[in-house]
């Protein structure tokens, strides 16, 4: 039993010992570093030779050549005609070296791996190989960097990782990529043309079905012109892609520019015979005097951004144009965005401007949950599909008068601006950040609505008339500096129909709480009042129902009626006898009083006469 356990442990140890060998089997083989001062004296050994005209590298795989110094000589390398040797490579490390003669493949295809260490700046006038790998975060300057065309037994390939490469082409030269070509990491590659040719051709070898160009991670590729202000004598494009699909993904970036020309043929920014695909956060900028971005295949943008502009032609030309979850800025003299088979825009923001229809297909145009701004001259539609344009859930600003109301066109749950005047169709939820500019007017019709959802912003600088409804969901943002709607009262400012903020001044004449009080006659016991109106909001009194004739509260009061004095005195001398007086008793008392009064008067007269006598 112990022997069996010991045997298992020994087997495990042996397996572990071989792990490093297996893991790194495909990586750089064990090598001897051979340092060469390229400006050094003539010398010859088994690994290299320096003579009066050149430097010859002799050993593949087993040697890492570290190059330093400066020379006008060329470096010569030889490949092999033996198919079994195609995986053998020359390994070269650049250490602030200048080789004005370049690295020249003298015969047969060559595989080459070049290391450009961080912090180094190097110049190799010409670099080419059938299978070329360049890595390291340093800088390499050249006048030509190419992947040559495949042979019967060695395919072409390119892989650039992290390196900054600047290629300035002579006026009569261009560089080419063949086979599968990949730029990744932080590769930053710039080609500048000399004025007669596109600086970079991709997939030039006919019959090779392996051609492709892929940009990944943060890789960048620039195909520029030496002098954009001076026209060429013929068409000079920025980047020419033949039988090779183009793929950008991650945060990669491609920029290409075409030149003006004194001939009738101008330069395109990017011209391709195959499909172009943009994913993630990648971006393409293509500008030219002919088409900005032209492909005989399909253009598919799923994420990222496209900028394509032309002075004298279309911004984008492709068979099928599909823009999804992306942003596009397109300008042209002819239709800025042209899809010969179809144009489909979904969850995207597209700005298109042309001296013709801005967004056009001879077949169909479909726009879904997108923001579109299409600008064309007077008399032109901004957006047109000859076999129908369908719009759904989108914010459309077009300079044309198209309504999409008649078949085969259709529009649902959208906002449509024709020029500066817009309206809602159905119930629209904005698909992204939108703005009503200062000179724009939007009518939200009855039974229609606009909703601002989470993480979206609605900005209003213009005029909005809300007869339907405007709502903001949690997380949505409304920015409004041009308020409208609502009603001011005697105590409150108006509330904006859009942002729900109070604005303006109070309206002292608008009394929403005006209460009518009917007139009431006064009595001896209670005051009365005139007819009047009282505002419960501001506490004021008015003599009219319009609330225009303000009065004091005291003016509404009618005083009590005055009291009767005689009635008050009689009330104080009433008999305590509970029996009612008769009319006879009353007359008897009256006569008795009169007799007594007459007697007194007669007595007074007799007494007066006696005294006279």
Regions found by a protein language model. Give the residues of each.
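Positively charged n-region of N-terminal signal peptides that target proteins for export
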Residues: 1-5, 10, 609-613
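Ser/Thr/Gly/Pro-rich low-complexity, disordered linker/stalk segments of secreted
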Residues: 467, 473, 561-580
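Short, hydrophobic alpha-helical membrane anchors of single-pass surface/secreted proteins
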Residues: 5-7, 585-596, 606-607
